[in-house]
Regions:
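Amphipathic alpha-helical packing segments from all-alpha helical-bundle domains
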Residues: 114-140, 151-166, 183-194
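Secondary-structure edge/capping motif, primarily at the C-terminal ends of alpha-helices
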Residues: 68-76, 102-109, 137, 141, ...
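Hydrophobic/aromatic residues within well-ordered alpha-helical segments
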Residues: 53, 57, 61, 84-87, ...
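C-terminal peripheral helix-coil segments that are non-catalytic and often amphipathic
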Residues: 170-220
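Generic hydrophobic, amphipathic alpha-helix propensity
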Residues: 3-11, 28, 53-57, 61, ...
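Hydrophobic alpha-helical connector segments
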Residues: 52, 67-97
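Amphipathic alpha-helical segments used for helix-helix packing
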Residues: 95-117, 133-136
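Helix-turn-helix
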Residues: 6, 14-52
Length: 220
């Protein structure tokens, strides 16, 4: 593995574990057992590392958010709820791998204009995907009140996506990556739960049971 890639991987791990604010370029070099000069040869300090990490993250997430959510061939799933569940799982896996961006996002957006612009664009893409997902899920709903438009529900879903990792940090619960992602998916889909049809409602109930079992396993 090339040194530049090792630097990015190590920086991501340290940022996730210790918080971006608490990690310096020298900390990253020390962890890699390389000289600070070697690190600066590849990146212009911590700012350069953050810029590269966010650029990679933005490309990956934007590509996922461009997915055709209402296409039955997407993820080979014809059931809208299963398709949405799998899509959100993949999306949240990427977000979890770069969770330091969400644990300190307001501060990062204030300090780095490129991150501010990128995060705002990603929020718009998340809202668009959430609206598609809500439209797909509510197509077979039993009854939808006039105020429960896909756009209204999408706002709540996108907000949960944007701030869930930060909420978990403040909650202080020790969850594995799988448990955290699973619960986040459940929370996002819960905004559509009151309007799901019988078949999808049964599937959602099963998802809740899976989530409960995972949490019980982690506490035992």
């Amino acid at each position: 593995m090339k040194t530049a890639q090792r630097i990015l991987l190590t920086a991501t791990r340290l940022f996730n574990e210790q918080g971006e604010r608490n990690v310096t370029a020298n900390d990253i070099a020390l962890e890699l057992d390389i000289s600070p000069g070697n690190l600066y040869y590849h990146f212009k300090g911590k700012d350069g590392i953050l810029s590269a990490l966010f650029a990679d993250y933005y490309r990956e997430l934007a590509s996922l958010l461009a997915a055709p959510l209402i296409d039955d061939s997407f993820l080979d799933q014809s059931n809208p709820l299963e398709r949405g569940w799998l899509f959100l799982t993949v999306l949240l896996e990427v977000m979890y791998q770069h969770r330091f961006l969400y644990l300190n996002q307001s501060d990062l957006m204030q300090r780095y204009p490129e991150i501010d612009r990128g995060m705002r664009r990603l929020m718009a893409l998340k809202k668009r995907s959430a609206a598609q997902l809500a439209t797909d899920l509510l197509a077979s709903a039993d009854a939808i009140p006039p105020t429960a438009t896909p756009e209204h529900i999408a706002d709540s879903m996108a907000m949960t996506l944007m701030y869930w990792l930060s909420f978990e940090q403040f909650a202080g619960e020790s969850l594995s990556a799988q448990q955290s992602i699973h619960r986040a998916v459940l929370q996002v889909l819960s905004h559509c739960a009151p309007y799901l049809g019988e078949k999808q409602g049964d599937f959602f109930a099963e998802c809740e049971l899976i989530n409960t079992r995972l949490l019980e396993k982690s506490s035992s």
